[in-house]
Design a protein with these regions (language model features):
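Hydrophobic alpha/beta core scaffold segments
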Residues: 400, 414-444, 448-457
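Active-site phosphate/pyrophosphate-binding segments
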Residues: 296-398, 510-517
């Protein structure tokens, strides 16, 4: 039976005469559809007669077509070898020994290549190869594939051929000889026997020629002092492993001081063995890596550093030079001097003060001590530039005395304090030519610019210390065939038709003393007879007298420095280094002025966190002798000496950089007279700066279970139990306290079968240098996300190095304060007490802690993953199956160590993240053994499973047992201090098995019960 019920949607439908009802009957949509926006052709739209049915057909077809297309995998076209090179086996990496020296950084290297592509830098661990790669050297592999390299030659900014440049230079040399005007080679420190020989031949052929060495960051005062005492322009070497007492006055020797490379020998003396470790005093203005590692750090201005040096000189030598030392430093400086004197030959003093008189006193003190750590055998041939000669060159250029200027490895238009003066003088030079990797500031104003080869594309040699000879060999053919190596150009200008390789080989034959050329190429280094520089005489008393006349800075004292990431700025276009967080401030993508809390309060400067956790700060302008830098962001730095400020060099470049990399200010403009200390005036300006800071928590707040510390006295005291300084966390079971490590919520597997990997992190040996961070980046194809994503806490580093300050003068006092909390409120209440513990001390102790996935045996991430994308192996590694991951991020929420990283975007092949690795050339650096992750996928440290599996398979193929040390991860392989040791704990003879049983061993957040396979070692301070 039919129903008479009437259904309606609105009251208006009950009225048959309603205009609304009529409209709804004739029109499906109340409002007109904005078809103009997607159909585009508005003129034809009105005459279109397409029916709704046809329209749906077209939409349906296109939807189906798009769906079918999406089912197809991407087509990747590969070009096979016509004749496969014998030495290349697809899927098997090759390693080549080589050497890098760019005038600032030096290292003996192994270069990993895959199918002919260099993809990773590793340390050459052969005996004699003592210089290891820092973060910048590890990142230099990416600069090879920089699409903004200068790919050809240019004359007057127009593309040309090398032949045209060559002809013009030869004509210019002939004109200079006829006119009797100067021909000047302006280079960085070369330390290359073959290149120096070529230059000598060039000067012989050009009688008016000069060779002037210019280093952007000068060590001229130290060179001048050493030359006046030893008779050669070089620098002393140091072996800190031989020192029981180390006193550093303004020298960041764990950073870039005099070329760096001292962390290995320093770390040997810092790991407590047989109850002994070195005692280290650091006196400095800026907080540095060396200051962070010190047992006793004195934050003082450069003026007070000079006075401290004079006092130590008096104590060690018995002199009576006038000393004007601020009262608050006297006790600690005298303590350092007395301990240094007591150490005798086991003591050493170094200084970074840019003053010849100060450097003479350093030599006098070490001579008086007969210091074993002060090594004059095999002196350093580094940063040999002369400030006076560079200044004279500019005068000669202004006077029109220079006809031809040939530059290589330098960028004076960027790095000279008064670059406008240099540019003006350059206009008076008839011909100028620059050999450069980039069309940088100097190349742009030179009449001729020549793109040169990268060190990974070149032959070369380096003798960075006397008696050692290192070779540079190409690991790939030049990516840009029109580039020209500087040495080959010199050969042609000398009228020598030889290839530079043949010239190099002939030069080396007289140095390697009959050794096999092929063997030296294979090893990358040859060690011959090492000469010793002999102490001469100098007027040390006059030097002390002159130094005592020093005056404090008028107003604030500016101390210019170089950051661990960018150094002198040569690799400013390298996104790995731009995104690398500074070990001290934890800020990336910026330079800034560091000020003390006291000075910040006086000037009204602030740092603060906004709602999303991002760090913001004030702006200032800095003025030195009439030169002003505007809008410099401010970081309030714990440990900055009151009355001093710091700014890093190497930023503010504009030429040949992608827009994203054009960050910071150029502090070289304040580097007056090549002195890193200047009187400066700071003025607060309007605005707030947004920092990309990866660590907002500055202190431990007394949480001693994260970074455990003790003193050497307690460590050595037989009356003190290990439990007292390496306390094991307890939990309650049935109201009975038991050790947390004994409690299991899961049934444990038998892990004694096969391999079981552990990674050891020694807090005593870690200097925070960050080489491991960049090595991990390279090995595991970690993406670069840019400043704004870092600011949103979306950085992708698999390994981070946390930095903590003490709230009191030491971490032990923080713990003591926390233990004495009584109730919630009051003088000893925890509410106010924890707030105070969040504020870092004016001169805090510092601790670094490398944190990566802990590869927990009872991993909280594994239990919450709904698709089993993360799981555990019998070898102790926590695995990620990227193709199973659906991006719930439950694992990241449940990880107590916060080490998982989520791909918020598709970083690969995405123009929004154009950081080298996304263009065709940049992708050549990718490791084929590691998958490139896509959007929506979680990733983390894999404990370099591709490396461990290769080691296992290689040993299986060879039918042998794996030796201790063969198992490596990218981070452990890059660590030059021994802070990171990786291995198989089931091999009871292995180093890591020994470290697991060490009294200093503990696990991070042990009370959580995750049972990690990463172990840490208690930090011991020799206070």
């Amino acid at each position: 039976m039919s129903s008479n019920k009437k259904y309606w949607k609105s009251v208006e439908e009950l009225n048959e005469n309603s205009s609304i009802v009529e409209t709804l009957r004739n029109n499906e949509f109340v409002e007109s559809i904005p078809t103009d926006e997607f159909l585009g052709d508005a003129t034809k739209l009105g005459t279109s007669s397409t029916t709704r049915r046809d329209f749906l057909k077209y939409v349906g077809f296109t939807t189906a077509a798009a769906s079918l297309a999406a089912c197809e995998g991407p087509v990747i076209k590969s070009i096979p070898y016509v004749v496969q090179p014998e030495q290349i086996i697809p899927g098997v990496a090759d390693f080549y020994a080589t050497t890098v020296f760019d005038g600032f950084d030096f290292a003996n290297l192994l270069v990993k290549t895959a199918e002919g592509r260099p993809i990773k830098i590793e340390n050459n661990k052969l005996a004699g190869a003592k210089f290891t790669a820092n973060a910048r050297v590890h990142a230099s592999i990416l600069s090879l594939y920089d699409s903004m390299r200068l790919k050809e030659s240019k004359i007057d900014a127009k593309k040309t051929t090398w032949e045209a440049v060559n002809a013009k230079v030869k004509t210019s040399l002939s004109e200079a000889k006829s006119a009797g005007k100067q021909v000047v080679l302006l280079t960085n420190t070369l330390a290359s026997p073959s290149t120096e020989k070529l230059i000598a031949e060039f000067l012989l052929a050009n009688p008016t020629g000069k060779h002037i060495i210019y280093d952007a960051v000068s060590e001229s005062p130290a060179l001048d002092a050493f030359e006046s005492v030893f008779g050669e322009r070089a620098l002393a070497n140091y072996d800190f492993s031989k020192a029981a007492v180390i006193v550093s006055v303004g020298a960041d020797f764990l950073g870039d001081w005099q070329g760096g490379g001292y962390d290995t020998s320093f770390a040997k003396g810092r790991i407590p063995k047989n109850g002994k470790m070195s005692k280290f005093f650091q006196m400095e203005a800026n907080m540095t890596l060396s200051g962070a590692a010190a047992d006793k750090r004195l934050a003082m201005s450069t003026f007070n550093q000079k006075q401290a040096l004079l006092h130590i000189y008096n104590v060690i030598t018995g002199a009576s030079a006038k000393v004007t030392l601020t009262e608050k430093y006297k006790i600690d400086v005298n303590k350092a001097a007395q301990q240094l004197k007591s150490a005798g030959s086991k003591g050493v003093l170094i200084s970074g003060i840019q003053d010849k008189n100060a450097q003479l006193l350093v030599l006098a003190i070490n001579k008086a001590l007969s210091s074993e750590a002060f090594v004059t055998t095999g002196t350093r041939q580094i940063r040999k530039g002369s400030n006076e000669k560079v200044a004279q060159l500019i005068k000669d250029m202004k006077a029109g005395s220079v006809h031809t200027l040939i530059m290589s490895g330098v960028n004076p238009v960027y790095t000279l304090p008064d670059s406008k003066d240099f540019v003006g003088a350059l206009k008076k030079v008839a011909n100028s030519v620059t050999f450069s990797l980039k069309e940088d500031e100097t190349a742009l104003v030179s009449k001729m610019a020549v793109g040169t080869t990268h060190y990974l594309e070149s032959w070369g040699d380096v003798a960075i210390t006397k008696g050692t000879y290192s070779l540079t060999q190409p690991t790939i053919r030049p990516l840009f065939p029109e580039t020209k190596q500087f040495q080959q150009a010199l050969l042609e200008w000398n009228g020598n038709n030889a290839n530079y390789y043949d010239y190099l080989k002939a030069t080396a034959s007289s140095i390697i003393a009959g050794a096999s050329w092929n063997q030296v190429v294979h090893d990358g280094i040859f060690v011959g007879a090492i000469p010793t520089a002999t102490f001469g005489s100098a007027d040390f008393a006059s030097a002390a007298s002159a130094l005592s006349q020093s005056k404090p800075a008028a107003g604030l004292e500016l101390v210019l420095n170089t950051k661990t990431g960018l150094g002198d700025g040569q690799q400013a276009n390298n996104p790995w280094l731009q995104e690398f967080p500074d070990p001290i401030t934890r800020v990336s993508w910026d330079n800034y002025v560091t000020v003390s809390k006291v000075d910040a309060d006086k000037l009204g400067l602030k740092n603060f966190n906004v709602a999303n956790g991002g760090l913001n700060g004030s702006y200032v302008s800095a003025e030195v002798d009439g030169v002003k830098l505007e809008n410099i962001p401010v970081i309030i730095q714990p440990g900055q000496a009151i009355g001093t400020v710091g700014i890093a060099l190497g930023y503010g470049k504009k030429a040949a950089l992608k827009e994203e990399m054009q960050v910071g200010v150029n502090a070289y403009t304040l580097y007056k007279n090549f002195n890193n200390v200047q009187s400066v005036t700071l003025t607060k300006t309007d605005g707030e700066h947004e920092f990309a800071c990866v660590q907002l928590q500055k202190t431990l707040m007394g949480r001693g279970d994260i970074i455990k510390e003790t003193t050497l006295d307690i460590f050595n005291n037989p009356q003190v139990k290990v439990q007292d300084w390496n306390e094991q966390p307890m939990v309650s079971i049935d109201h009975n306290p038991v050790k947390a490590v004994t409690v299991d919520l899961w049934t444990s597997f038998d892990r004694s079968v096969g391999h079981h990997f552990n990674l050891s992190v020694d807090l005593n040996a870690c200097t925070g240098c960050g080489a491991c961070v960049i090595a991990c980046h390279a090995e595991n194809n970690v993406p670069v996300v840019g400043k704004m994503e870092v600011r949103r806490s979306r950085d992708m580093h698999w390994l981070r190095i946390d930095r903590y300050y003490s709230s009191e003068t030491s971490f032990s006092k923080d713990d003591e304060k926390k233990d004495n909390f009584d109730g919630l409120t009051g003088d000893k209440g925890s509410l106010g007490g924890f707030g105070e513990l969040e504020i870092a001390s004016e001169n805090p102790q510092v601790a670094f802690q490398a944190v990566m996935c802990q590869h927990c045996n009872h991993a909280p991430c594994e239990t919450v993953c709904p698709v089993a994308a993360t799981s555990h192996s019998r070898q102790g590694q926590n695995h990620m199956a990227y193709n199973r991951c659906v991006g719930t991020r439950y694992c990241a929420n449940n990880c107590p160590y916060k080490v998982r990283r989520f791909n918020w975007f598709l970083y690969n092949k995405n123009e929004e993240f154009d950081y080298h690795m996304n263009d065709d050339m940049g992708r050549m650096v990718l490791n084929p053994d590691v998958n490139v992750r896509s959007r929506g996928v979680m990733e983390k440290c894999s404990m370099c499973i591709q490396m461990t599996q290769k080691t296992i398979l290689d040993a299986k193929r060879d039918g042998r047992v794996i030796k201790d040390g063969e198992f490596q991860t990218a981070c452990s392989n890059a660590c030059s201090t021994g802070a990171l040791i990786f291995g198989d704990v089931n091999d009871k003879q292995s180093k890591v098995a020994e470290l697991v049983e060490d009294d200093r061993m503990y696990h991070l957040l042990e009370s959580v019960g995750t049972k990690p396979n990463v172990i840490y070692h208690v930090k011991v301070r020799n206070t």
